[in-house]
């Protein structure tokens, strides 16, 4: 009996270990400005490993989030999906996306419920992932529950990134910077 319990415990622990993400295959592209950018569907691993996003790791590791932030968000994460539209060329994205991803890591947000799209300077992707979503500024973080948009963060915080994201996830009243 002890052997079965021990084996079950080991299987459970091993299956709960998060496997590191692999970058989504993507080729750097030349933007209309001549700058080399990422374009299309990407993930955090792309940002961590690409030669053109060296800013990401530096920003991610310099950010310190309040360890208490997000403790009350767990009940609100069920069914939550997030689409991130950003530009690797964009200073606002370079400032907000590492911070946002650090916050998601802190609350152990399921990366399977997160989609990241790197956009051109014209706010487009070759696959038109932005179609119908009214992306005018980057970064734009769109939060969905049951396939319906519940709210969005656009370009810069109204109060602070932590406060804004917390309000959106909890379903509290929140109006982004451009409304």
Regions found by a protein language model. Give the residues of each.
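Positively charged n-region of N-terminal signal peptides that target proteins for export
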Residues: 1-4
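C-terminal motif of bacterial Sec signal peptides marking the signal peptidase cleavage site
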Residues: 14-15
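N-terminal leader/targeting and pre-domain segments
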Residues: 21-77
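Local sequence-structure signature of Cys/Sec-based thiol-disulfide redox active-site neighborhoods
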Residues: 74-106
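Loop/turn elements at helix/coil->beta-strand transitions in domains of secreted/extracellular proteins
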Residues: 78-81, 112, 146
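Thiol-based oxidoreductase modules, predominantly thioredoxin-like and allied folds used
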Residues: 83-88, 111-125
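Thioredoxin-like thiol-disulfide oxidoreductase module
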Residues: 116-137, 167-169
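Non-catalytic, surface beta->alpha helical segment in thiol-disulfide oxidoreductase systems
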Residues: 137, 142-179
């Amino acid at each position: 009996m002890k052997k079965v319990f021990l084996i079950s415990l080991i299987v459970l622990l091993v299956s709960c270990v998060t496997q590191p993400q692999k970058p989504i295959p993507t080729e750097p592209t030349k933007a209309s400005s001549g700058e080399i950018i990422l374009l299309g569907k990407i993930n955090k691993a792309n940002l961590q490993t690409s030669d053109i996003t060296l800013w990401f790791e530096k920003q991610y590791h310099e950010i310190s989030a309040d360890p208490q932030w997000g403790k009350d968000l767990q009940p609100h994460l069920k069914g939550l999906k997030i689409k991130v539209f950003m530009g690797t060329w964009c200073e606002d994205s370079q400032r907000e996306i590492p911070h946002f991803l650090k916050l998601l890591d802190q609350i152990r947000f399921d990366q399977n419920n997160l989609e990241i799209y790197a956009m051109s300077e014209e706010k487009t992707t070759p696959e038109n992932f932005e179609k119908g979503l009214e992306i005018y500024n980057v970064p734009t973080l769109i939060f969905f529950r049951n396939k319906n948009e519940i709210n969005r963060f656009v370009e810069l915080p109204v109060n602070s990134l932590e406060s804004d994201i917390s309000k959106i996830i909890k379903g509290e009243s929140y109006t982004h910077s451009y409304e």
